[in-house]
UniProtKB/Swiss-Prot annotation:
This is UDP-N-acetylglucosamine--N-acetylmuramyl-(pentapeptide) pyrophosphoryl-undecaprenol N-acetylglucosamine transferase. The gene is murG. SUPFAM superfamilies: UDP-Glycosyltransferase/glycogen phosphorylase. Pathway: Cell wall biogenesis; peptidoglycan biosynthesis. Cell wall formation. Catalyzes the transfer of a GlcNAc subunit on undecaprenyl-pyrophosphoryl-MurNAc-pentapeptide (lipid intermediate I) to form undecaprenyl-pyrophosphoryl-MurNAc-(pentapeptide)GlcNAc (lipid intermediate II). It is found in: Cell inner membrane. UDP-N-acetyl-alpha-D-glucosamine binds at T11, G12, G13, N123, R164, S188, I250, Q295. PANTHER family: GLYCOSYLTRANSFERASE (PTHR21015:SF22), UDP-N-ACETYLGLUCOSAMINE--N-ACETYLMURAMYL-(PENTAPEPTIDE) PYROPHOSPHORYL-UNDECAPRENOL N-ACETYLGLUCOSAMINE TRANSFERASE 1 (PTHR21015). HAMAP family: MurG. GO terms for biological process: carbohydrate metabolic process; cell division; cell wall organization; lipid glycosylation; peptidoglycan biosynthetic process; regulation of cell shape. It is a peripheral membrane protein.
Length: 368
């Protein structure tokens, strides 16, 4: 029986690609045995929901932690010992890390034990974990071209960022001519700066006939809903479709993308993988405090391809955001061109492609 370990932790941007690849590998190789190793973040709960056995290791970020980093050797030694024991017990044929500090030690331990190893990098600017691991793992899978030459070229392949299979079907949704539909996404947790910017221009958007669907995030949902109700008070409803829909979290993202004519969003790797696979034009506002400002680089990649416009968050106060949104929605030819450019950057089969590569590594385990 073939055995695969996937390892990562911390945020959904790392965890969901790992789960997507694990699920693809199990579908492509019935009987495959998969173990998820992570830290104390949400990965344990998410792995359980996916039906995967999970092992938690002590793991903490070191980069930028100052004096707290002095304790790193102690928990790292403990984590190495635990990881080594689990790897020896599970006896994997291949181990793949998906970034995040919780994904470092299992990959490093597996490499030292002679197990084939790989990593996947979601962002255009690699994190510290993958920068280090990329020097000695057998394979590196990336979402964006490795233009900076961070990883060894002979062992690196751009296969994309794994997403849910239903997202790509949004690209074939029937067009809705004459509509002006804006989908606003701030990531799974929402984004207060984006919520505030959209609420400030909501009356202008509605006056221009724009329909808005906004994922506010759980923490900001009540506040944004109250603001939206205040804007709608006294307005006469137009047509059968609601003018504004505020949600704390959108479960059916495929349907949301199929509905939208334009997406206003952050520039996280998963969001951009979904936007391109769905073939949607986008207006991107990168999160300015992301590690190494990788969202700005992510957004610039799509902007250069003609698939998106990118606006720095600190430029929002001086920007005619309403005019920008209304101008884009009022130019169907430009939206079509941006959508086609987005599709041109899409790699919608990333989960299957990475899974196949890992299964091939496992099949040739003894040939390393």
């Amino acid at each position: 029986m073939t055995r695969l370990i996937v390892t990562t932790g911390g945020t959904g941007g790392h965890i969901f690609p790992a789960l997507a690849v694990a699920e693809a590998a199990m579908r492509l190789s019935p009987g495959l045995d998969v173990l998820f190793i992570g830290g104390a973040g949400p990965e344990g709960e998410l792995a359980a929901k996916a039906g995967l056995p999970f092992v938690a290791l002590p793991a903490k970020g070191v980069f930028g932690r100052g004096i707290k980093a002095l304790a790193a050797p102690f928990w790292m030694l403990r984590a190495f010992g635990l990881a080594g024991a689990r790897i020896r017990e599970f006896s994997p044929d291949v181990v793949c890390g998906f970034g995040g500090y919780a994904g470092f030690i299992p990959v490093a331990a597996a490499r030292l034990m002679g197990v084939p190893t790989a990593i996947h990098e979601q962002n255009s600017v690699p994190g510290v974990t993958n920068k280090v691991l990329g020097r000695f793992v057998d394979r590196v899978f990336t979402t964006y071209p490795d233009e900076g030459g961070v990883f060894p070229a002979t062992r690196t392949k751009r296969l994309g960022n794994p997403i849910r299979a239903d997202i790509a079907r949004a690209a074939s949704a029937a067009p809705h001519p004459g509509t002006k539909r804006l989908l606003v996404l701030g990531g799974s947790q929402g984004a207060k700066a984006i919520n505030d910017a959209v609420m400030a221009i909501l009356p202008t958007l509605l006056d221009a006939g724009v329909k808005v669907r906004l994922q506010a995030g759980r923490a900001d949902f009540e506040r944004v809903t109250t603001q939206a109700h205040a804007v709608l008070a006294g307005r006469e409803a137009k047509g059968d479709e609601p003018e504004v829909v505020i949600e704390n979290f959108i479960d059916d993202m495929a349907a949301a993308y199929a509905w939208a004519d334009l997406v206003l969003a952050r520039a996280g790797a998963t969001t951009l993988a979904e936007v391109t696979a769905a073939g949607k034009p986008s207006l991107l506002i990168p999160f300015p405090f992301a590690t190494h400002d990788h969202q700005t680089v992510n957004a610039a990649f799509l902007a250069r391809a003609g698939a998106a416009q990118s606006v720095a968050q600190n430029h929002l106060p001086g920007l005619d955001l309403a005019g920008t949104v209304i101008g884009l929605l009022g130019d169907p030819a430009r939206l079509e061109a941006m959508g086609q450019a987005a599709l041109g950057q899409a790699l919608p089969h990333a989960a299957d492609d990475i899974a196949r590569a890992l299964l091939a590594m496992a099949a040739h385990k003894g040939e390393r």
